Amino acid sequence: MRRLIFIPLLILWAQAAVAASPTIVDGDYVAEAIARNAVVWDVRPAAAYAKGHIAGAISIGDAAKVLRDENTEDFIATDRIEKILGLAGLDPHREIIVYGSRGTWNAYFGLYTLQYFGGSNVRVYHDGIEDWTAAGRAISLEAAHLPPVALKLEINPTVTVTTKEMVARLNDPNVQIVDVRTSQEFIGEDIRAIRGGHIPGAINIPYEQNWIDPETPAKLARKQTTNNGGMSLKPAEDLKRLYSRLDPSKETIVYCQSGARSSETAGVLQQLGFTNVKVYDSSWLGYGNTLDAPANNVTFFNVGLFNSRLSALQDRVNQLEKELAEARAQKSQK
């Protein structure tokens, strides 16, 4: 009888904890946070920020580009990040709201960055600038600034794993792995490292599945829609069904190609009450390039096929240039 009583109480406690300390918030929450002097961080590129941002929001430019090495896509040296965040007045230990454009992973990367460096009072405004503008809230064109702060950042090991730690966790029944890449990446058809494939035991749930309409970016590209409303999150019950194969009490490691897309799913899982979520920061770029790390559906880049297609493309370019030159010559003779 005690066990029957204890389990529902545990579930209620977890639900209450999520409600009291959400990871993902709406515009009303952001407005209230601003009123109590929370920091608002706009992670979009500088050009987007300059066209209009939440009044008082600060910017360091495109956070994912500024804070990561362009080759490895891992974080740059911690002392450099200390200077960048410090000059912007971004202290991870303050209350911070992170936002970007609706649904994009960039805001979640900001969340993960702050958690990685010890932040525990950080939220994501998923619907971002579009929702804020639609609600008629204050927008500014003037850059906001906070007083600089001296930072000494330390990595929080509870929110991330290294490649070595990832390999050590393979076949651990208390660990579950989520691959948020496309299905083509997962099965090795789309190769973005030395080899394609996926980590053994991982289940594939592309991060776009968190949205009401995962096809929204493609529809925008095809001009089948004019807004990104479909990139709002699914209702909580739908998200719970999406991740019903997972145990919220187990260690859950999320990865993608470089730790960017996975940060969004990590944030969603935190919102759903998963208690031990980690982002594999180096993700497949690190794992796929570690050739002695076990992998499934392994494929390798076909250099011969690539060269053949490149040669065919060059032939086509040469033909078009020849046709263009002939057309110009004929035109000049008239």
Regions picked out by a protein language model, each given a short descriptive name:
Residues 19-39, 46-97, 101-176, 180, ...:
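Rhodanese-like catalytic fold shared by cysteine-dependent sulfurtransferases
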Residues 5-16:
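Bacterial N-terminal signal peptides
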